[in-house]
């Protein structure tokens, strides 16, 4: 069955434009309540990030779910992985996240976790979609779901984060923490501080509009400057819903998801944890693959998206995977990507090696990689375009086996990502621009 509303990461779009409207979200809550309630669900959790529209959609979901006869527990602003954690520890049937992740405040989205703290399976999402086309009804008055807030959600999640790095002592470390004015603004700084670090908070004053604006993992420049200015040991950058992590070393150099994945995987292997292999994506730098190979760790590429990384991890029985963008998954700690937990795993690895971040990533050399996001409405079938095919063949000939090309439509935005990787940075950038120009003509 073709999906009508759910994309690769729930329902997402511009606030006020269908389907990100209060009336649709009301009905989505009702449909979810009907489907999950019929499966024996007693309650559904709702959490959100800090964008202004979150309050509106929280109310809509709350009304829809309770109209279907299912109880609701409101978590307030909380990182996406925190909602996943509480869904399973509070024995909820599902957790709903109101967030558009790293997108600006003008966007929002709705995604679901199942009772196990993992993304809701396709079968249930399709059941919910089917009900969205039916007439909404309300249960009898005595069966309407009850709603209450979970006042200690923040504290529960902070304690969980700390528990994933037992014995970690950050005394003597100075860490700049950029929470992107997002869901971790009142959580991540406290986690590191409670473990002994001196914390310099950055972008931790959300006003409903400034989420991800010139801050966080998508705009780490301010963090890079602040780390140098404060003479900090390192910096941590999260995104708006705190499931992504990038870091900055003491000199202000950005450390991406591929490099962090290497640090965590090597640490697991060196310290006797089960480490058969690592799952990356089609976008993962070839340098990561080479570095893991040198450590005797197998590397497999999944399609882009944490959903597909998780599928490969489950299929192979592995624990560690991630994306260049900073989605790191440590299934030996939690059930989904978690920026704060991932940062603690990196810090624990540095502590065990008695190294700084720059020294620890020196063993993974990233090949020059250029990516251009090409916007356009006509993404379907662009790979069959003759001009695009000819341009790709030409670029592959000129790379002469010393690089790779990837063209990939975004799952959440109207754009195509054009990526080229190779040994010579100037050549890579030139070829990427050439190919992007051809793609732009094809999709516009």
From Swiss-Prot:
Post-translational modification Phosphoserine, affected residues: 101
Q: Which reaction does it catalyse?
A: alpha-D-glucosamine 1-phosphate = D-glucosamine 6-phosphate
The cofactor required is:
Mg(2+)
Q: What UniProt keywords apply to this chain's record, in alphabetical order?
A: Isomerase, Magnesium, Metal-binding, Phosphoprotein
The cofactor note reads:
Binds 1 Mg(2+) ion per subunit.
Q: Which InterPro entries match?
A: A-D-PHexomutase_a/b/a-I, A-D-PHexomutase_a/b/a-I/II/III, A-D-PHexomutase_a/b/a-II, A-D-PHexomutase_a/b/a-III, A-D-PHexomutase_C, A-D-PHexomutase_C_sf, A-D-PHexomutase_CS, Alpha-D-phosphohexomutase_SF
Q: Which residues participate in Mg(2+) binding?
A: 101, 239, 241, 243
Output the Gene Ontology cellular-component terms: cytosol
* Protein known as: Phosphoglucosamine mutase
Biological process terms in GO annotation = carbohydrate metabolic process; peptidoglycan biosynthetic process; UDP-N-acetylglucosamine biosynthetic process
Q: What is its EC number?
A: 5.4.2.10
Post-translational modification here is noted as: Activated by phosphorylation.
Segment forming the signal sequence: none
Q: What class of enzyme is it?
A: isomerase
Gene3D superfamilies xrefs: Alpha-D-Glucose-1,6-Bisphosphate, subunit A, domain 3, Alpha-D-phosphohexomutase, C-terminal domain
**Family, as annotated:** Belongs to the phosphohexose mutase family.
User: What does the record give as the function of this protein?
Assistant: Catalyzes the conversion of glucosamine-6-phosphate to glucosamine-1-phosphate.
GO MF term set: magnesium ion binding; phosphoglucosamine mutase activity; phosphomannomutase activity
Active site (UniProt): 101 (phosphoserine intermediate)
